[in-house]
């Protein structure tokens, strides 16, 4: 994760996905002088920092996330931890990668894999739809932006790289494989 301080406040951000048009977005960002990127990976701008830069172009986190997801050709799923302890979870606009919310005795959690919180005694509470944005607190969660209608989940979750004890869209990976 990266720690970001901007006009939107202090927040930590982590992302998963692929930004196919990263160079184009970087060039657009540089067209307004005074910007730079600090996190580089293999000579390229770090995709998480690029996502944060896109988010910071708007007046609030929700509008910023929607802007970033619309600008990205590819997939952008993210989690943001705000300074007041809330988690903002956003699934990519096509729903390629999962985002799941767990519920347990100690509160709520969020993960890209259901087995991660099952091992801690949490149960499934919600799976975000494509483009959906949710705010998660210890005592519950609420939808900040409703899900879109088009779903293009990655089929390789069940056949190749999903953990056998994970569930995606209500279907267990191990059951789907055998």
What is each PLM-predicted segment?
Residues 1-129, 135-178:
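Conserved short alpha-helical segments that host acidic/polar catalytic motifs at enzyme active sites
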